[in-house]
A protein has these predicted regions:
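Transmembrane-helix boundary motif in ABC transporter permease subunits
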Residues: 77-107
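Generic hydrophobic transmembrane alpha-helix motif, especially the helices
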Residues: 108-144, 151-152
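Short cytoplasmic-facing helical segments at TM-TM junctions of multi-pass membrane proteins
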Residues: 148-193, 214, 218
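Transmembrane alpha-helical segments of polytopic membrane transport and secretion proteins
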Residues: 1-25, 246-263
């Protein structure tokens, strides 16, 4: 039997493909407009054709993939760590209004502090290895993910929670049966919002701490005037960010549609 959700999934996939194509077109158009309106030397500013020619060389791609893999690994560590910590803290705050009133303003204020100013302290404390890189990535993910997840937990209908408790359910049971199902789509939203931030955090950690991955290579390329490789790295990272963002957006829509249909 054909699943009733198949047509909607196909529509979501088609919509995601169109959005991805539109994003790529807008980026390339903006890139070309920038090159034609700003007087920058062609030696420094590379065109889409220059990047295409660079990436068309197999040796160039072979040298870039391991660096990209390291950056994505660093980003994944920070992304997963930040999301897990945000999920735990948001659950704790959702269970306790006093804790939320005590700590949430401070956590929100921390978001206003540029990570560039904190990164040297983090590097001194945790070193230039995996721990320091993961901490920086998690730090840039944590606060926006926390606020989004907490909003989802608070969105559970009060009437449903009261019904659950009226039938003898504990606070934890009400959370599992009512609060968490309503929060799941919002948690996917948190993942979509922060996934590109985690890649930026990984690049920042590689620039300031480890010197590894594409972040470290981009710093060396800027110092060594390897502008074709630098622009190609930026394009590859941008493409990865757009693709990952669209995949998570599709998952978010699919989960939201499924949760809405089952309520």
């Amino acid at each position: 039997m054909t699943s009733p959700y198949l047509p909607s999934r196909l529509r979501l996939a088609a919509r995601g493909a169109l959005v991805l194509l539109g994003s790529v077109t807008a980026i390339v158009a903006g890139w070309m407009i920038f090159l034609h309106t700003v007087e920058v030397s062609p030696y420094v500013a590379k065109s889409p054709l220059d990047v295409w020619n660079y990436l068309s060389v197999a040796e160039h791609r072979a040298a870039m993939w391991p660096l990209l893999g390291r950056t994505l690994t660093d980003a994944a560590l920070g992304f997963a760590s930040g999301l897990l910590l945000a999920a735990a803290v948001s659950t704790l705050l959702a269970f306790s209004r006093p804790l939320e009133e005590m700590f949430l303003p401070t956590l929100t204020t921390l978001r206003a502090i540029p990570m560039v100013t904190l990164a040297p302290i983090i590097v001194l404390a945790l070193g230039r290895g995996t721990a320091g890189t993961a901490f920086i990535g998690a730090a840039v993910v944590f606060v926006p993910a926390l606020l989004t997840m907490l909003q989802g937990l608070r969105a559970a209908p009060r009437a449903d929670l009261d019904v659950c408790r009226a039938f003898g359910g504990s606070t934890w049971t009400a959370y599992v049966k009512v609060g968490l199902p309503h929060a799941v789509p919002t948690w996917f939203t948190a993942a979509r919002i922060t996934v590109t931030t985690s890649i930026v955090g990984a690049l920042l950690a590689e620039w300031l701490a480890s010197g590894a991955g594409l972040g470290g290579q981009m710093m060396r390329d800027a110092n060594e005037f390897q502008f074709a490789r630098l622009w190609s790295s930026v394009v590859v990272l941008t493409a990865v960010c757009v693709a990952v963002h669209q995949v998570l957006a599709l998952l978010e829509r699919a989960v939201s549609s499924r949760m809405t249909a089952t309520r």
